Amino acid sequence: MSGFAFKQFKVAHEQCAMKVSTDGILLGAWANLSNANSLLDIGTGTGLLALMCKQRSPQLTITAVEVDKNAYQQALQNIAASPWPNIEVHQQSIQTFNSAQPFDVVIANPPYFNHSLKGNNKARNIARHTDGLSFAELISAFKKLSHAGSTFSLILPTTEVAVFIELATQNGLFLNTHCQVKATPNKAISRSLMTFSYINQSIVESALCIKDNENNYSEDYIALCKAFYLKM
């Protein structure tokens, strides 16, 4: 199996354009799930985020949406082989997805390349570029599928953060928590973990280095992810 083995589940990813990545692991471990009963994973890919969140909060009712047929099939297989086969997966675009009940938490590791050159792999282009799911459409989907107390957590490259925050603000959303991520202490900030809601409150800021100066996983990263990695 081509994939990644975690402590409680395995994720095959050979059929997916976007493989298991540190971005996904960061978001799945970091997202605030407190007081939540329902969660929507937008663009689930391998099913990684849905599985991580279910491990963290087994009481969650989780729904995952994936537009790509091969990734959808892979997510189904990964979820069926996990301890939580009742995670629901839909093959359709989030733009056309509807739910009778709003979700408490929405989570996404979205496409983020706005103006970059594309390769020949159509599925990978869809997974990585905003043509198939723009930031505006992502925010619109959250607003359609949420309630007044819902939260929206995502991870983005630092270069896209200002644009996303501006769009979110224009749509009545507020940044509540923001964790800036570096690969190592001497590297520039490369990623931002963010949670938005309809509530205007003081932003909780934090920082995280994935590895230390000796190229070992940092204490903070281990504390965040040790429930998942086999060798932590």
Swiss-Prot record:
Cellular location(s): Cytoplasm
Cellular component GO terms held in the UniProt record: cytoplasm
EC number, as in UniProt: 2.1.1.223
UniProt-listed PROSITE patterns: N6_MTASE
Keywords carried by this UniProt record: Cytoplasm, Methyltransferase, S-adenosyl-L-methionine, Transferase, tRNA processing
GO BP annotation list: methylation; tRNA processing
Catalytic reactions of this protein: adenosine(37) in tRNA1(Val) + S-adenosyl-L-methionine = N(6)-methyladenosine(37) in tRNA1(Val) + S-adenosyl-L-homocysteine + H(+)
GO molecular function annotations of the record: nucleic acid binding; tRNA (adenine-N6)-methyltransferase activity
Annotated signal sequence range: none
Pfam families for the chain: MTS
InterPro entries: DNA_methylase_N6_adenine_CS, SAM-dependent_MTases_sf, Small_mtfrase_dom, tRNA_Adenine-N(6)_MTase, tRNA_adenine-N6_MeTrfase
Record family assignment: Belongs to the methyltransferase superfamily. tRNA (adenine-N(6)-)-methyltransferase family.
Protein name per its UniProtKB record: tRNA1(Val) (adenine(37)-N6)-methyltransferase
Species per Swiss-Prot/TrEMBL record: Pseudoalteromonas translucida (strain TAC 125)
